[in-house]
Swiss-Prot record:
SUPFAM superfamilies in UniProt: Class II aaRS and biotin synthetases, Nucleic acid-binding proteins
GO molecular function: asparagine-tRNA ligase activity; ATP binding; nucleic acid binding; protein homodimerization activity
Source organism (scientific name): Escherichia coli (strain K12)
This protein's encoding gene: asnS
InterPro entries the record matches: Aa-tRNA-synt_II, aa-tRNA-synth_II, aa-tRNA-synth_II/BPL/LPL, Asn-tRNA-ligase, Asp/Asn-tRNA-synth_IIb, NA-bd_OB-fold, NA-bd_OB_tRNA
Tagged with keyword Lipoprotein: no
Origin organism lineage: Bacteria, Pseudomonadati, Pseudomonadota, Gammaproteobacteria, Enterobacterales
Name of the protein described by the UniProt record: Asparagine--tRNA ligase
Length: 466
């Protein structure tokens, strides 16, 4: 007899009358007056638990089975049969039930069988994957990550691992976590009285990365098409539903590509992964549509069918100025569009995903290619109905003299970026890329409102538990 995941039993991949073993945790136990107990056993392989039907003739029925409570771990062996009851097609007629682990005090078990607030679940993040919600989020997160890897592999991209420790500030915003082994009680000082980072582990001031982009560009200028996918860090003191101090970013980079090329790539990628999650995680998506956001499934279906709208930033500002809507944040040329502006464009004006292109240079990063007008850069944001910006990207500045001028304007020391500038000195090429915040993508797919609930252990200001 074989050990099988619960998903194989429920989805008909195990023949009826087969003897199987499933291993998992008790969701609920129900006892009938006829001396039969019904255990709902889950193992995380799918959304639903499998029902194990246990007769009181089992030797350990009174001693073990009747003591089982939510959270106990069990190994159930029995025959797969068609279920006469509603709610499941198959169940297991148990011939053996082993208890692998008890819940010490069922009355104080934090995940007892009742609904908990999302805020409470954050306080017990080590146990919250046992809930329907966080378990479903975890499976969707996995499926989206696998679909992204699959998409880029099929498109001929190479996955590049970029460093988490860096001396470069990709965004130029300075909101970075410092990495140091210096003794905080006895910091070395230089002649100016400043901290002497020459004495530090790396011999210079070092940080956790805010982006793998700059390193990714070096490989794109050798392998043509690459992507990075990993954790990034922002020391931004923001307590909002959209911000994390540690989050995952996907960043493709393509040599010989312009802004339109990567806008097309972004559209194809999003539609590919949305289709994958609807097909591969239908059970979890059904749960999200029923319990979290009634539009969870239909929103993705509409997205897949939609043609992306495209609009210049300047035209987008004109649309917003003339729409008759009073926004909380004022609209004028040169302002960075806020979430309410983005959502108006996607949800009300275009009623479709929108690519906004050619932003003012003063609100964008130093590496974005300066347009011929000298005022805007070849940058883009993909705006999705229901969330606003989901992707940000640009054509990169491949001209060394223009790049140096932009660095000077932004107060950056070009010598700190000597290796990045070398790409423009040795066989420079036009190249482009974008960044996708993975947690924001998961929030969009699931309808979960706060990104703290779509990453296993959220890191936010004054919170690094677990």
């Amino acid at each position: 007899m074989s050990v099988v995941p619960v998903a194989d039993v429920l989805q008909g991949r195990v023949a009826v009358d087969s003897e199987v073993t499933v291993r998992g945790w008790v969701r609920t136990r129900r006892d009938s007056k006829a001396g039969i107990s019904f255990l709902a056993v889950y193992d995380g392989s799918c959304f639903d638990p499998v029902q194990a039907v246990i007769n009181n003739s089992l030797p350990n029925y009174n001693e073990d089975v009747l003591r089982l409570t939510t959270g106990c771990s069990v190994i159930v062996t029995g025959k797969v049969v068609a279920s006469p009851g509603q709610g499941q097609q198959f169940e297991i007629q148990a011939s053996k039930v082993e208890v692998a682990g008890w819940v010490e005090d069922p009355d104080t078990y934090p995940m007892a069988a009742k609904r908990h607030s999302i805020e409470y679940l954050r306080e017990v993040a080590h146990l919250r994957p046992r809930t329907n919600l966080i378990g479903a989020v975890a499976r969707v997160r996995h499926t989206l990550a696998q679909a992204l890897h699959r998409f880029f592999n099929e498109q001929g991209f190479f996955w590049v691992s970029t460093p988490l420790i860096t001396a470069s500030d990709t965004e130029g915003a300075g909101e970075m976590f410092r990495v140091s082994t210096l003794d905080l009680e006895n910091l070395p000082r230089n002649d100016q009285g400043k901290v002497d980072f020459d004495k530090d582990f790396f011999g210079k001031e070092s940080f956790l990365t805010v982006s793998g982009q700059l390193n990714g560009e070096t490989y794109a200028c050798a392998l043509s098409k690459i992507y990075t996918f990993g954790p990034t860090f922002r020391a931004e003191n923001s307590n909002t539903s959209r911000h994390l101090a540690e989050f995952w970013m996907l960043e493709p980079e393509v040599a010989f590509a312009n802004l339109n090329d990567i806008a097309g790539l972004a559209e194809a990628m999003l539609k590919y992964v949305f289709k994958a999650v609807l097909e591969e995680r239908a059970d979890d998506m059904k749960f999200f549509a029923e319990r979290v956001d009634k539009d969870a499934v239909s929103r993705l279906e509409r997205f897949i069918e939609a043609d992306f709208a495209q609009v210049d930033y300047t035209d987008a500002v004109t649309i917003l100025e003339n729409c008759g809507r009073k926004f909380e944040n004022p609209v004028y040329w040169g302002v960075d569009l806020s979430s309410e502006h983005e959502r108006y464009l996607a949800e009300e004006h275009f009623k479709a995903p929108v690519v906004v292109k050619n932003y003012p240079k003063d609100i964008k990063a130093f590496y974005m290619r300066l347009n011929e007008d000298g005022k805007t850069v070849a940058a883009m944001d993909v705006l999705a109905p229901g969330i606003g910006e989901i992707i940000g990207g640009s054509q990169r500045e491949e001209r060394l003299d223009v790049l140096d001028e932009r660095m000077l304007e932004m107060g950056l020391n070009k010598e700190d970026y000597w290796w990045y500038r070398d790409l423009r000195r040795y066989g420079t090429v036009p190249h482009s890329g974008f960044g996708l915040g993975f947690e924001r993508l998961i929030a969009y797919v699931t309808g979960v409102q706060n990104v703290r609930d779509v990453i296993p252990f959220p890191r936010t200001p004054r919170n690094a538990s677990f």
